[in-house]
Curated annotation (Swiss-Prot):
UniProt entry tagged with the keyword Lipoprotein: no
Primary localization class, coarse: membrane
Source species: Elsinoe fawcettii
Gene assigned in the entry: HP2
Signal peptide (UniProt feature, chain positions): 1-22
GO cellular component, one term: membrane
Domain of life of the native organism: Eukaryota
Role: Part of the gene cluster that mediates the biosynthesis of elsinochromes, pigments consisting of at least four interconvertible tautomers (A, B, C and D) that have a core phenolic quinone to which various side chains are attached and which play an important role in fungal pathogenesis. The non-reducing polyketide synthase PKS1 was proposed to iteratively catalyze decarboxylation between acetyl-CoA and malonyl-CoA subunits for polyketide chain elongation.
Protein name per its UniProtKB record: Elsinochromes biosynthesis cluster protein HP2
Induction: Expression is up-regulated during nitrogen starvation or at alkaline pH, conditions highly conducive to elsinochrome accumulation.
Localization per record: Membrane
Residues bearing glycans: N187, N248
Membrane topology: Multi-pass membrane protein
Organismal lineage: Eukaryota, Fungi, Dikarya, Ascomycota, Pezizomycotina
Alphabetical keyword list: Glycoprotein, Membrane, Signal, Transmembrane, Transmembrane helix
Membrane-spanning parts: 94-114, 148-168, 209-229, 309-329, 344-364
Amino acid sequence: MVLLYILIMVALIPMYMTVVQDATFSHPPPGLLIPEAWSGSGSIRLWTDAQEIPVRCFWKLVYDPRIHPETAAIQQGDSIMYMYSGTRFLDYRTVLSALLLTFVFFWRMLSMFDRSRNRFQRACVSIPSALLEVCRQKAIKKTATLPFYGQALYFGIMCLYTAHIVLWDFLNSFAGTLWLITLNLANGTAQIINLRKERHRNRHDEESSWTFGQIVPIVLLVSPLVAAFEDLLSKRSRRALREGSVGNTSLNEVDLTPEPSLTEATTLSLHTRPLIYSVPTSITQSSIASQKSSGTPAQDLIRSSWPYAILFWELHVLLAFMVIWLPLAQSQLFIFRYAYWEAYYAFPAAVGTFWLTVVIAVPFSSIGRSSYPCPKPRRSGLNVA
C-alpha cells in the first residue's frame, strides 16, 4: 500500500501541475525555438539561458519579471491561479490534491490495525463526543437559572454534536471513502483534459495526443476506486459463504447421524435442535447489536432522528455535486477556466449548505423537542434528562 501511495502521488504531478507547463515554457531546455510573438524580440530566436531541469520544482513556480521579462505578458493571465508571494506562485491544486490523497491513505491505512484504529477513534471521535456530552449536561443545569441562555447554549451544542456524529459516521462508511477517492479522481482527470487543450500552438498537437505516459496517471488514480469496490464485493462473498457454510454444516450433522429407534431419534432431535438454530441466532443477535451503536442516549437520539438521515444523504449529494462541478468549472465551458478561486467556490458553498441544514433541522426535529431543557417540566410535558 505504501508503494501504491507513492505511485499515486507521482501520478498527481502531470494532472495538477499546470506549473509544469508554465515552468517548461518559462525555462525551456537549450535549443528550443521561441516564436516572435512570445519572445518579444521581433524574430524567432534561440533560448539558451536555462541550463537546469525545466520542472525542477513541483510545488512552486519561480517567476521574476526582472530575470525573464519575455514571459511576463504570457504568465500574466495565469497568475490568478496562484497566490503571489514575493517571486513565487503557489499552485493550490497540487496542495489540495496531495492533502486529500494523503488523508484518505493514512485514514484507511490506520483503520487496518486494531491499536491505531482504537487510538484514532479515541482521539477524533470519543474525546470530542465526551466533551460535547459534558457541555450538554452543563447546559441543562444552566437552564434552571438562565432559561434563554441555557436553551441557546444547548441548541448550539446539539448542532455541533449532530454535525460531529454525522460527519464521522459518513467518513467511516464505505460510501464516504468512495466519494473522497472519486473527488480526487475527477479533479485530476479534469486537469489532464485541460492540459490536452493546450493554448500554446507549438505544443498543441503533442499535448492533444494520448500516449501511454498520459494514460498511466488515470489508471493509477482509478486503482484505489477499483480496490475499494473489490473489497466490498469480497466482503459480501465471504459473508454469503460463511452463512452458507454454517447452515450446511448443521444440516449435514443432522442428516448423517443414525436413528436406530424412536427413543434415540427423539433424544437426538433434542440435542441437535439447539445446534441447528443456535449459531444463526447468535450471528443475528451480534449483527443487530453491532448495528445499534452502544453510544450515549444523546447519540442514539441523534442517530434515530430524521435530521441525521437528511444530513447523511445531503453529504452524498454535495460530494456528487463537487465531483460534477470541478471538471466542468475547469473546462472551456466557463469563462473563469483559469480563475482558481471562482472554480472552487463550491467548497465553501457546500460547507455553508451543510451547516445551514444543521441549524434549520435541529430545532424542528425530535432532537429539539425531546432534548431542549425546560425549567418547568409540568407546563411543557418534557422530562429533563
